[in-house]
């Protein structure tokens, strides 16, 4: 039997870190013994636990320890991180450490270094002479890069549950359900957005990004989101060809997928409107030219151009067109999405499972994340794929956006 002590510190009960350590140890066929356990009595008090983890072999124990580090366990008397150079571009040394999306530090030459730009499913590349470390996706690893291997010298810090009563992310920290009070949730989201916008206006940092699908337009939520962009609540939009195309279709023809937005009735010949919209943008050259020439006079994309809000439109094999602004190289789109979202304070994901999962994979866990979808399974899938910090609002996205705008405008009047 091979054994190693681990430590857990912080709000390890409220944040379910202790429970996760117990569960993962047993799931992997290991065992544990609690050596010390000091529970904080007050809300501001942290807890501490020391556990003895055991495995059948050293390799088995190492596997368990790596999993436990990913949920926040620390190994006392940690050795320096083990580094090995990559022998080829995009080829990693055996035993490389695969990252989580949580803030991470590595111990190099007896000093702890914060790993820049945390994201899941990447590797840690260390620059010892510069006392610097960063995550890199496998395709960006170059020959000679020092890649972290094993589990020594790594400290992972998952986000803890908020201890402040009434905060959105404390209020929502429970199972995904369609039976939660929508009005109360929307008010708390609006309050959080208002605070983030005010901070952004003062500092120019942070802000809110939207990850949006075409259902925003189909359900009639487009004008509400466009107004939020105009009011300065949105600092970036990440979407695909469909959102932009149907937003432009709505602006030019008053339809989405050929259905009248106001009456919800199909329009004769409306099935061609989205192709007409693509053609109009192709003729203008791009969305910006369409706005400046007066072809496009309203909508989400119009407000992005008018208010200088960056957007990243990532292409898909399903796309019609696509419009000229769409990035058809998926790796280029991925890089631009990550750059755009990394510094944001909040990301709101609106009715687009695949784009939400893709964005969640690119960003650190400390970014506040809200996922809105009429299907509870969408939020569950997002969390199961690693974006565990996301809170879910199960509702129609069009209704959500209209009510959210109403609450934001109410907060505007109180200023």
Curated annotation (Swiss-Prot):
Keywords: Lyase, NAD, Nucleotide-binding. Its cofactor is NAD(+). Signal peptide: none annotated. Its EC number is 4.3.1.12. Pfam families: ArgZ-like_C_1st, ArgZ-like_C_2nd, Saccharop_dh_N. It is an enzyme of class 4 (lyase). It comes from the Archaea. InterPro entries: ArgZ/ArgE-like (IPR005239), ArgZ/ArgE-like_C_1st (IPR048964), ArgZ/ArgE-like_C_2nd (IPR048963), LOR/SDH_bifunc_enz_cons_dom (IPR007545). It catalyses: L-ornithine = L-proline + NH4(+). NAD(+) binds at residues 241-242, 320, 352, 354-355, 373, 396-397. Catalyzes the conversion of ornithine to proline, with the release of ammonia. Belongs to the AgrE/ArgZ ornithine cyclodeaminase family. This is Ornithine cyclodeaminase. It comes from Methanococcus maripaludis (strain DSM 14266 / JCM 13030 / NBRC 101832 / S2 / LL).
């Amino acid at each position: 039997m091979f054994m190693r002590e681990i430590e857990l510190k912080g709000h390890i009960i409220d944040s379910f870190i202790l429970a996760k350590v117990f569960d993962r140890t047993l799931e992997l066929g290991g065992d544990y013994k609690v050596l010390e356990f000091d529970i904080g009595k007050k809300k501001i008090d942290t807890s501490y636990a020391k556990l003895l983890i055991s495995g059948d072999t050293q390799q088995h124990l190492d596997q368990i320890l790596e999993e436990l580090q990913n949920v926040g366990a620390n190994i006392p008397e940690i050795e320096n991180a083990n580094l090995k150079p990559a022998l080829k571009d995009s080829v990693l040394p055996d035993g490389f450490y695969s990252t989580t999306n949580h803030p991470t530090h590595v111990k190099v030459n007896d000093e702890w270094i914060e790993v820049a730009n945390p994201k899941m499913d990447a590797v840690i590349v260390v620059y010892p002479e510069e006392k610097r470390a960063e995550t890199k996706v496998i395709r960006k690893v170059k020959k000679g890069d020092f890649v972290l291997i094993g589990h020594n010298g790594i400290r992972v810090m998952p986000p803890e549950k908020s201890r402040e009563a009434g905060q959105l992310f404390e209020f929502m920290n429970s199972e995904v359900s369609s039976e939660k009070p929508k009005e109360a949730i929307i008010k708390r989201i609006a309050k959080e957005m208002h605070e983030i916008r005010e901070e952004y206006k003062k500092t120019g940092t942070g802000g809110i990004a939207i990850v949006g699908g075409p259902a925003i337009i189909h359900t009639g939520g487009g004008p509400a989101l466009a107004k939020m962009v105009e009011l300065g609540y949105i600092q970036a939009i990440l979407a695909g060809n469909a959102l932009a195309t149907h937003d432009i279709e709505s602006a030019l023809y008053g339809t989405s997928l050929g259905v009248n937005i106001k009456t919800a009735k199909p329009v004769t010949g409306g099935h061609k409107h989205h192709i007409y919209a693509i053609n109009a943008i192709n003729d203008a050259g791009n969305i910006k030219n369409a706005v400046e020439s007066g072809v496009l006079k309203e909508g989400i994309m119009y407000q992005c151009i008018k208010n200088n809000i960056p957007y990243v439109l990532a292409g898909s094999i399903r796309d019609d067109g696509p419009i000229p602004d769409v990035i058809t190289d998926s790796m280029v789109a991925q890089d631009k999405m990550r750059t755009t979202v990394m510094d944001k304070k909040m990301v709101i994901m609106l009715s687009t499972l695949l784009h939400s999962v893709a964005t969640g994979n690119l960003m650190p866990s400390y970014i506040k994340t809200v996922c809105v979808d009429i299907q509870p399974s969408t939020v569950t899938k997002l969390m199961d794929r690693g974006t565990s910090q996301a809170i879910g609002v199960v509702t129609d996205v069009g209704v959500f956006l209209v009510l959210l705008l109403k609450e934001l405008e109410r907060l505007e009047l109180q200023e």
